[in-house]
Structures are given as structure tokens and as C-alpha cells.
């Protein structure tokens, strides 16, 4: 894994208790207040998914709705506004389409890594949820996860013992 610049990222700002319009951006940096809650209180969530080019040339995105649901679950846990599933899907589909030229060919075994990120950008000192957030999605091509192919390992799972429990 590594970062390689692509053409575009997409962003949706949350202000005044509502999500704004989807914005297309080519800038790689995010202007941020030094008291942003993501910096001081960890008010941040991210997902990771991939787009693959099939043998037929069609682009397929792995587990899109499941990633949206997991991000929403994280948001509930750390008091961030949930991005609706349809908005999540809209952002992912848009950024993949805009950067389609970076999706590796089927034969390579590689993919386009998709990183959705939601951060608290509102300035806040004290443990309180931010009033402003940024949802941003960027992509980068990545090689196969198992470079030498997938092979099994001779490990045994022992279910009777747990290192963190008595007798473990």
C-alpha cells in the first residue's frame, strides 16, 4: 500500500446540522482549524474498500453498502452525524468514475483503493462533538494484497485457552 496522486477526490461538508452538496476537488490538502475536534479528541472515522476491473472490463466495487453501514455505526459511537447511505454511495461512485483511468487491468490482480474519511472540523476546546464535519473520499491504485499469491499456513486454532483469561 502507498499513496499515489490521482485526478480527483470528492467532499461533502456538514454545516448548520445538514449535509451539503457533493464537491469535486483536485486539491490534496484540507484547510483545517487548529482546534478541530479530529485533531484533539479523535473525532474521525474511515473505511477502506476497493474497485476492481473485471475480466469483462466492467468496474466492480466491493461491499459498498456494508462499508456505508459500518461508517454509520462508527459515527453513532463517537457522536458524529451519520452520512446517509445514498450520499455515501453517490460519493464513492463519483470518485471512482472520475478516476477510472487509474483502475488497474484485470490481469494485474491490482485494484483502486477507496478511502472514505469523515472528520470533525469544527473548532472545539473541551470534550464535545464538533458542529462541522468533512466527508472526503480519495482513491489510489494499489497492487495485489498477497503479492506472491495466497497460500495456507500450518497454524492450529486452540479454542479451549485464551491468553487474556484465567487458565489462558
Region annotations inferred by a language model:
Residues 1-168:
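Conserved alpha/beta cores of soluble small-molecule-handling proteins
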Amino acid at each position: 500500500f502507498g499513496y499515489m496522486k490521482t485526478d480527483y477526490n470528492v467532499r461533502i461538508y456538514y454545516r448548520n446540522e445538514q449535509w451539503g452538496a457533493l464537491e469535486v476537488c483536485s486539491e490534496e490538502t484540507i484547510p483545517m482549524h487548529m482546534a478541530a475536534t479530529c485533531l484533539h479528541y479523535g473525532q474521525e472515522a474511515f473505511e477502506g474498500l476497493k474497485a476492481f476491473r473485471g475480466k469483462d472490463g466492467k468496474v466492480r466495487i466491493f461491499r459498498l453498502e456494508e462499508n456505508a453501514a459500518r461508517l454509520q455505526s462508527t459515527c453513532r459511537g463517537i457522536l458524529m452525524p451519520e452520512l446517509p447511505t445514498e450520499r455515501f454511495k453517490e460519493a464513492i461512485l463519483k470518485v471512482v468514475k472520475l478516476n477510472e483511468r487509474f483502475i488497474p487491468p484485470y490481469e494485474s490482480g491490482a485494484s483502486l483503493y477507496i478511502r472514505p474519511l469523515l472528520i470533525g472540523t469544527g473548532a472545539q476546546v473541551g470534550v464535545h462533538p464538533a458542529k462541522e464535519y468533512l466527508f472526503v473520499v480519495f482513491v489510489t491504485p494499489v497492487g495485489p494484497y498477497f503479492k506472491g499469491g495466497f497460500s495456507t499456513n500450518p497454524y492450529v486454532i486452540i479454542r479451549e485457552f485464551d491468553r487474556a483469561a484465567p487458565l489462558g
